Amino acid sequence: MEIIHLSEIDSTNDYAKELAKEGKRNFIVLADKQNNGKGRWGRVWYSDEGGLYFSMVLDSKLYNPKVINLLVPICIIEVLKNYVDKELGLKFPNDIMVKVNDNYKKLGGILTELTDDYMIIGIGINVNNQIRNEIREIAISLKEITGKELDKVEILSNFLKTFESYLEKLKNKEIDDYEILKKYKKYSITIGKQVKILLSNNEIITGKVYDIDFDGIVLGTEKGIERIPSGICIHVR
């Protein structure tokens, strides 16, 4: 997969989107620093130097976006397990978490944008970057966990090898979509939790997460069972 490496940019997702609109597919935009990194619903994603920030563009007619959405975080977890000896997990919808002193802290996040023609998967991982004081309670870097600087290029390379290996197995029917879902659920730290889900219209839904499938989470609420496709998830207990 072609990699376009930039030292500094506002947003890898935005840059990738412009190229995707011109018809470019199956490439990565990698930046050493983002000045306007975006999280879910346009929230700020701090992207200081030292972190791994990249956006991957795939043809949405060639791949099932619902499967890719689950596969990407699985691949990140499987790669990062080689660098840290702590428990790693996925918080719905796509936060990469690590357990530190009985609490989970955020190691990275994923933002997916989808059209009929292409999908952009933006990935940010705290590797060697200094975590800002205002988010130190909830976020951590690999450097802080391991006590040493890690090779970001190696991490990206290992991610791509893992991701492309899974794609090949799916293509050859060595594994199916439901095996990907099963693996995602194995890493999930949201299933079984009491949560608050903030929706894009600012509505908050509270309930217990009974399951996760390709269409989101299955939530038990006061109204009964609801399926929530996406949202910002806060674990209550």
Curated annotation (Swiss-Prot):
Residues 1-191 form the BPL/LPL catalytic domain. One of its GO terms (molecular function) is ATP binding. One of its GO terms (biological process) is protein modification process. The keyword Nucleotide-binding applies. NCBIfam families: birA_ligase. Belongs to the biotin--protein ligase family. This is Putative biotin ligase. It comes from Methanocaldococcus jannaschii (strain ATCC 43067 / DSM 2661 / JAL-1 / JCM 10045 / NBRC 100440). The lineage of its organism: Archaea, Methanobacteriati, Methanobacteriota, Methanomada group, Methanococci.
